[in-house]
Swiss-Prot record:
Residues 20-50 have a biased composition (Acidic residues). The keyword Ribonucleoprotein applies. It comes from Schizosaccharomyces japonicus (strain yFS275 / FY16936). The keyword Nucleus applies. Keywords: Coiled coil, Nucleus, Ribonucleoprotein, Ribosome biogenesis, rRNA processing. Its main location: nucleus. This is rRNA biogenesis protein rrp36. Residues 30-63, 167-215 form a coiled coil. Residues 201-229, 256-266 have a biased composition (Basic and acidic residues). Belongs to the RRP36 family. It comes from the Eukaryota. Residues 1-131, 201-236, 256-287 are annotated as: Disordered.
């Protein structure tokens, strides 16, 4: 009937009969039974294979000596530790990346607290300039005229003549400070004036010493030049001999004055202090 209806072209009038439905249901049931039997046999085969594999592995493990098993266990432990360390390092890096600025500041404070006397840590990072340097511009070099050959050699006599007014200014300043010290009543102000006078007087003394050394050495050179003209060999002074000449000139300039006595007393005190330092220390008395 279905075939006749299809030939006629009327699909809406097609109605399956009971016989056709019974035939299809019986065929489906037979297919399902076959599939279930196949699956059950596959599962049974898998279970049997797993059992045989387990039995074979157990036999192999029984045949392995205990020392080899211990070595394998240690190797597994070491690999596990390495794996955890690598993962820990990766986690710490990720934490640093996703760390908030407040957390990083707290870490910096803790680090500073831990290392109190450590040197200051400075970042080596530098901002990239916006403009690229196409032409290299040489950096201007600063020049100190005191130590540069372009300024020429130092002529001490010329400098003294050119800057002689500085010495006169210092002498006038010393007189002014001495007068101010007499009239001043404040203790702090008096101390400051005394310090200023001390520094100025020491500068004057230093200037006089330099002039004396220059004069003594100049006289010695002139005398040696005269001896060379007479056909004698030149004699060059050592540092120790220069000091002796300067001391003799100093004694001659202070002869017949109280300044020589004061100078000798100071010198004796210095020598006594040096000798005292060289003496061995006294042992403590044992009770």
């Amino acid at each position: 009937m279905a075939r006749n209806s299809l030939r006629k072209g009327t699909l809406s009038s097609v109605k399956p009969s009971l016989e056709d439905l019974n035939d299809t249901s019986e065929e489906d049931y037979e297919v399902e039974d076959v599939m279930s039997e196949v699956e059950s046999t596959d599962e049974a085969n898998d279970e049997s294979e797993e059992k045989t594999d387990l039995e074979s592995t157990q036999r192999q493990l029984k045949s392995i000596p205990f020392s080899e098993l211990l070595e394998a266990q240690r190797a597994l432990k070491s690999e596990k530790v390495k794996f955890t360390q690598k993962n820990g390092a990766k986690l710490s890096k990720n934490r640093r990346r996703h760390e908030s600025p407040s957390d990083s500041e707290d870490d910096d404070d803790d680090r500073n607290d831990r290392s109190k006397h450590a040197p200051v840590e400075m970042s080596s990072k530098r901002a990239v300039p916006r403009f690229r340097e196409v032409v290299h511009v040489p950096k201007p070099l600063r020049r100190d005229p005191r130590f540069d050959t372009l300024s020429g050699n130092l002529n001490v006599d010329k400098v003294k003549n050119n800057y002689g007014f500085v010495m006169e200014y210092r002498l006038s300043e010393i007189k002014q400070l001495e007068q101010e010290l007499k009239s001043c009543r404040e203790q702090e102000r008096r101390e400051r004036i005394k310090e200023a006078l001390k520094s100025l007087r020491s500068k004057l003394e230093r200037r006089k010493e330099d002039e004396r050394t220059a004069r003594v050495l100049k006289e010695h050179r002139q005398s040696e030049k005269e001896k060379i003209r007479q056909g004698k060999k030149p004699f060059y002074l050592k540092k120790s001999e220069q000091k002796k000449l300067l001391q003799l000139d100093k004694y001659k300039s202070m002869e017949g004055t109280k300044a020589l006595d004061r100078y000798m007393e100071k010198k004796q005190k210095r020598r006594a202090q040096k000798e005292k330092k060289r003496l061995p220390r006294a042992r403590p008395d044992r009770a």
